[in-house]
């Protein structure tokens, strides 16, 4: 290594001599400003959005926890659908438990069903209750739309929604 390779003057804070400045990049087009990102739904380079904004109901669902909560739900009101069964009891806040047994499939399949159900439940404006959703093995083949319709049907049969 030669002495000419070593910096003789101290570098100013925040400047790295190895990187070009914002207007020194030869690949940057003149007169083009970077688009401002707007949270998780930043515009795609071609202009369209990558996904739809979440509904007003949005937010993370609270989970049912503990054996006692699940045991209490055995006495709750029940509704059956083709792919799902639901049980619920009135409560001070909405809490959801999702059960997908190993009969449904391997972990990847079970987790996909749980993700879909959580998203459906998040989008619905449900009243305050403790809700248990149990997926049957037939749910393995169901699409998102089929799960959505079946959950609505089961919730109506149980009396949680009109």
From Swiss-Prot:
Keyword RNA-binding: yes
Any one GO BP annotation for this protein: tRNA 5'-leader removal
Family per similarity comment: Belongs to the RnpA family.
The protein's enzyme class: hydrolase
Pfam families per the UniProt record, alphabetical: Ribonuclease_P
Region described as Disordered: spans on this chain: 1-63
More info: The open reading frame (ORF) for this protein entirely encompasses the ORF for the 50S ribosomal protein L34 (rpmH). The two start codons are separated by four nucleotides.
Gene3D superfamilies from the UniProt entry: 3.30.230.10
Keywords: Endonuclease, Hydrolase, Nuclease, RNA-binding, tRNA processing
InterPro entries: Ribosomal_Su5_D2-typ_SF (IPR020568), Ribsml_uS5_D2-typ_fold_subgr (IPR014721), RNase_P (IPR000100), RNase_P_CS (IPR020539)
Lineage: Bacteria, Thermotogati, Deinococcota, Deinococci, Thermales
EC number: 3.1.26.5
The protein's name in its UniProt record: Ribonuclease P protein component
Compositionally biased intervals (Basic and acidic residues): 21-38
Annotated source species: Thermus scotoductus
Assembly and binders: Consists of a catalytic RNA component (M1 or rnpB) and a protein subunit.
GO molecular function annotation: 3'-tRNA processing endoribonuclease activity; ribonuclease P activity; tRNA binding
Function: RNaseP catalyzes the removal of the 5'-leader sequence from pre-tRNA to produce the mature 5'-terminus. It can also cleave other RNA substrates such as 4.5S RNA. The protein component plays an auxiliary but essential role in vivo by binding to the 5'-leader sequence and broadening the substrate specificity of the ribozyme.
Gene encoding the protein: rnpA
Reaction equation(s) it catalyzes: Endonucleolytic cleavage of RNA, removing 5'-extranucleotides from tRNA precursor
GO cellular component: ribonuclease P complex
């Amino acid at each position: 290594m030669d002495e000419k390779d070593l910096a003789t003057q101290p570098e100013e804070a925040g400047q790295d001599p190895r990187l070009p400045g914002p207007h020194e990049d030869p690949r940057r087009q003149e007169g083009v400003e970077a688009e401002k990102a707007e949270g998780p739904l930043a515009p795609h380079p071609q202009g369209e959005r990558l996904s739809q904004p979440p509904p007003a109901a949005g937010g993370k669902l609270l989970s049912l926890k503990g054996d006692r909560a699940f045991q209490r739900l055995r006495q709750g009101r029940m509704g059956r659908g083709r792919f799902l069964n639901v049980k619920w009891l009135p409560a001070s806040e909405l809490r959801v438990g999702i059960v997908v047994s190993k009969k449904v499939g391997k972990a990847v399949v079970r987790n996909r069903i749980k993700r879909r159900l959580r998203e459906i439940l998040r989008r619905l404006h449900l009243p305050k209750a403790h809700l248990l959703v149990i997926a049957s093995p037939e749910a393995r083949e169901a699409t998102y739309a089929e799960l959505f319709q079946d959950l609505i049907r089961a919730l109506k049969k149980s009396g949680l929604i009109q």
